[in-house]
A protein has these predicted regions:
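Acidic-and-aromatic substrate-binding clefts and catalytic sites of carbohydrate-active enzymes
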Residues: 22-30, 54-56, 62-66, 147-148, ...
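An active-site-proximal structural segment forming one wall of the substrate-binding cleft
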Residues: 27-29, 35-46, 61-92, 96-138, ...
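Aromatic-rich peripheral "rim/lid" segments of glycoside hydrolase catalytic domains that contact
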Residues: 272-334
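Short, solvent-exposed turn/loop segments enriched in Gly/Ser/Thr/Pro and often Arg
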Residues: 49-52, 90-96, 181-183, 295-304
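Acidic/histidine-rich helix-loop elements
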Residues: 17-30, 58-64, 102-114, 208-242, ...
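A generic structural signal for well-ordered alpha-helical segments
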Residues: 79, 83, 253-255, 287
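Active-site region of glycoside hydrolase catalytic domains
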Residues: 2-5, 112-237, 245-268, 289-295
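N-terminal carbohydrate-binding accessory modules
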Residues: 1-47, 178, 252-253
Length: 334
């Protein structure tokens, strides 16, 4: 029997993405009760996807509205108060976002000016928060790079990461940095192992199951009714073994001394609930077997455990929350 490889460079953080400043159209207010609830139930990690447009003025990436940083300060302070590790992520940074609701004026992968502005923003964060230890705060540089070769190649990504890591380390050498894999976070980057920074995978495959009827994806209306096992992806029917093989590629990083975390996973609320839970348990078994922690996409909302508006769930009123009890218990189990 082959030895199971486990990552041991990061804690097995377990938690949620909280979407305070993720999109101009869908940011959430700061709710201290959410942090307390998450902590009280044994979770220890919050990923905060950020959109740089919140803190610039006049569409000028060098004109900074420092008042907005007070909200980020509050997020970090709540993390410290409730013993939750805070992972700050640029979901939109200068030159790139996987969310195409707004067209960036330049390309992070291709334009040096975009890269200069991008690293400048991370230097602002590095300077402002350099007194906060990495045990409490980490930086996740850019969310889910992807695109055609004329938008973002693997070589472009390596250039962006090396340049930005050096920029941050020049100010805060000890800061914990986590980078997403390429191709929407699904493919690891062993070529960056020498930087000794952690890497973040995703839990969204097969996409036909996790994003069934997702209203921002035109093709999602054409996906077959999900089932598990047996959901299709890339001309293959997925089951536990196919999923395991996918993450085996990731855990090879552990043998290179690289920490691994799953920064996002989840299932949109149109997938049948029993299918979502069955798939989710197989994912959590896979991740846990390698000591890889996780963060559900959304505490609240269509992927989350609170107010997810699933038509096939009877919600439990629990401590003032409308809880998807079965999904919540599944997360608690792992």
């Amino acid at each position: 029997m082959s030895k199971i490889i486990v990552q041991d460079k990061l804690p097995r953080w377990r938690g949620f993405n909280i979407l305070h400043m993720f999109s101009k159209s869908s940011n959430e207010p700061l709710r201290e009760d959410d942090y307390k609830f998450i902590s009280d139930h044994g979770f220890d990690f919050i990923r905060v996807p950020l959109n740089y447009l919140f803190w610039i003025l006049n569409n000028n990436p060098r004109d900074i509205n420092w008042d907005i940083f007070k909200k980020i300060d509050d997020i970090i302070n709540l993390g410290i108060k409730y013993k939750l590790h805070i992972n700050l992520n640029f979901h939109r940074g200068p030159g790139f976002s996987v969310n195409r609701e707004i067209q960036e004026p330049y390309s992070l992968g291709k334009d040096q000016k975009a890269l200069d502005d991008f690293s400048y923003h991370w230097q602002l964060f590095a300077e402002r928060y350099k007194q906060i230890p990495s045990k409490q705060l980490s930086f996740n540089l850019i969310n889910e790079t992807a695109g055609t070769p004329d938008e973002f190649t693997r070589e472009d990504y390596e250039k962006v990461i090396r340049f930005t890591v050096n920029s941050i380390k020049s100010i805060d050498p000890e800061r914990l940095i986590i980078i997403d894999g390429i191709n929407y976070g699904n493919i690891p980057c062993p070529e960056l192992a020498d930087l000794k920074i952690a890497q973040s995978c995703r839990g969204y495959l097969p996409i036909t199951l996790t994003h069934y009827k997702a209203n921002w994806m035109k093709e999602a209306e054409l996906y077959p009714i999900p089932k598990w096992p047996g959901a299709p992806h890339n001309e293959k029917l997925w089951d536990y073994e196919v999923m395991k093989n996918h993450y085996d590629d990731w855990v090879k990083l552990a043998d290179m001394g690289i920490g691994i975390h799953c920064g996002e996973f989840g299932v949109f609320n149109k997938t049948p609930h029993n299918v979502a839970l069955s798939w989710m348990e197989d994912l959590l078994i896979n991740l846990t077997s390698h000591n890889i922690g996780f963060a559900l996409w959304g505490f609240r909302g269509a992927f989350g455990i609170v107010d997810s508006n699933r038509s096939d769930v009877v919600y439990e009123k629990y401590l003032g929350y409308n809880i998807d009890r079965k999904m919540f218990d599944l997360l608690l189990k792992y």
